[in-house]
């Protein structure tokens, strides 16, 4: 029967029609996802928080609730998608900043300072408000640390390479670079999360203080 024909036995016109139909459906799905993602970013940028509902996203995007749940299992999955996209962007930006330096410690410092800056409101036209997503990542890490760690993989691997390079160059005395990378990331994330609740700017932990603390803890004499 016709339905039992293998793909190679099907008429060319049928294969072309199926391919065209799949391509159209794929493009339509991509457009719907883009609408939902755009709407979520707009809400985050306007409100400075991820405290909005699926219905808010649906209303802003012009899509339906049915379409939303065809694309995402819920709000958390949508936020995780935004987080993963922002981390990929962040990894590229961190690499570009690091590549401006040549010395191992200077490269590691550039990474640390930039990682801290990413948690701050940029105030630049066209840029997104990333801090609410960073806060979401901290909260999600308490219930799903494996998924969050996987999302941060591009950023984590870059840091690990920088630490390995610094150790190989004799600039750091670290026996376990994976643990050192985890300590540095956690210190940065905890510090800017803590800073949210401190009204006096003088009492907030700065990126420079984090760097000084880490570099001495890792057994290095920072360049003067």
Locate each region found by the language model.
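Amphipathic alpha-helical segments used for helix-helix packing
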Residues: 119-143
């Amino acid at each position: 029967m016709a339905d039992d024909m293998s793909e190679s036995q099907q008429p060319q016109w049928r294969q072309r029609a199926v391919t065209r139909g799949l391509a159209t459906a794929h493009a339509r799905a991509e457009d719907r996802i883009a609408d939902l993602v755009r709407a979520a970013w707009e809400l985050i940028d306007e409100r400075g928080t991820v405290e909005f509902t699926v219905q808010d996203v649906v209303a802003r995007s012009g899509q339906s609730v049915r379409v939303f749940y065809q694309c995402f299992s819920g709000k958390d999955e949508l936020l995780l998608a935004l987080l993963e996209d922002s981390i990929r962007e962040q990894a590229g930006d961190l690499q570009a900043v690091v590549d401006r330096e040549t010395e191992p410690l200077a490269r590691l410092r550039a990474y640390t300072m930039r990682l801290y800056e990413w948690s701050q409101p940029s105030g630049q036209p066209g840029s997104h408000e990333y801090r609410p997503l960073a806060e979401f990542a901290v909260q999600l890490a308490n219930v799903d640390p494996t998924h969050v760690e996987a999302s941060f993989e591009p950023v984590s691997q870059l840091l690990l390479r920088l630490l390995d390079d610094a150790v190989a160059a004799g600039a750091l005395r670290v026996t376990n670079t994976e643990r050192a990378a985890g300590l540095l990331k956690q210190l940065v994330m905890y510090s800017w999360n803590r800073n949210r609740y401190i009204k006096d700017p003088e009492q907030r932990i700065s990126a420079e203080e984090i760097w000084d603390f880490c570099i001495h803890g890792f057994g290095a004499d920072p360049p003067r």
